[in-house]
Design a protein with these regions (language model features):
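A conserved regulatory-domain signal marking ACT and ACT-like small-molecule sensing domains
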Residues: 91-94, 118-225
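Contiguous domain-boundary segments centered on the initiation and propagation of an alpha-helix
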Residues: 66-116
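A structural-propensity feature for long, helix-poor, extended segments
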Residues: 41, 45-84
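Non-transmembrane, aqueous-exposed alpha-helical and coiled segments at domain scale
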Residues: 32-41, 101
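Conserved phosphate/anionic-ligand binding catalytic regions in large, soluble enzymes, centered on
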Residues: 8-26
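Short, hydrophobic/aliphatic alpha-helical segments
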Residues: 1-10, 40-42
């Protein structure tokens, strides 16, 4: 435990779980969509559903979808900012089985029709855990730089990606492989110690068998004062 676990994050709003964590969940959805969200359906579970509006959870999630960090002074005005940005959204309640009480499910779509469904929980102190991506079970926190690689479930895809990362001297901190079924589409979630540059992400996306690569840059939040 460090001092930030005790004091919590720098943020706007009354609750690190309901506001800071919610903003990070929204921003994670935006980042992994890989484009500007134009439509969003936000579903709140448990404590998020019961007290989320009063604690500003709904505004924080929308703020994250707009690219705001937890300390952004515009968070209380996120609904107005969404209208300016052309982001159409709905917020409702959902009852999930075996989910953390501070859980949100976000379905987002960009102007080109690209879609993403993300389920994540705010676990305290502004920290989050992503539990599902497009219905596939995952587990990552956003505490590391994170690559999400969608690929055909075939021999060589994992080796190709990890070989390139090794050549770039990028150390893998954690990695998980997830799939619906053998031979279908799969997900690699790769958390790294080092920053990955935009052109390097693009190169990985061109590898055989790779469907898409999105990248969550932890440094984007670390640089916020």
């Amino acid at each position: 435990m460090d001092i930030f676990d005790i004091l919590g994050p720098v943020m706007v709003g009354p609750s690190s779980s309901h506001t800071a964590g919610a903003a990070r969940i929204g921003k994670m959805a935006r980042t992994l969509l890989g484009g500007e969200p134009m439509e969003a359906r936000i579903h709140l579970h448990g404590s998020f559903a019961e007290t989320g509006s009063g604690h500003g959870t709904d505004r924080a999630l929308v703020a994250g979808l707009l690219g705001m960090n937890p300390d952004d002074m515009r968070i209380p005005f996120a609904f107005q900012e969404a209208e300016k940005a052309g982001l159409h959204f709905t917020v409702d309640k959902i009852d999930l089985r075996d989910a953390h009480p501070n859980t949100a499910v976000i379905e987002v779509r960009d102007a080109h029709g690209k879609q993403l469904e993300l389920q994540a929980a705010s676990i305290g102190g502004g920290r989050i855990v992503v539990n599902k991506l497009d219905g596939i079970d995952v587990s990552f926190t956003g505490d590391y730089n994170t690559l999400v690689v969608r690929n055909h479930d075939e021999n060589g895809a994992l080796a190709a990606v990890t070989t390139i990362l090794s050549q770039l001297r990028i150390n893998v901190a954690n990695m998980s492989l997830c799939r619906h079924k053998r031979g279908g589409d799969a997900l690699m979630v790769i958390e790294t110690d080092q920053h990955i540059k935009t052109h390097q992400v693009s190169f990985l996306a061109e590898l055989p068998g790779i469907l898409s690569v999105t990248y969550y840059d932890k440094e984007d939040e670390d640089h916020v004062s």
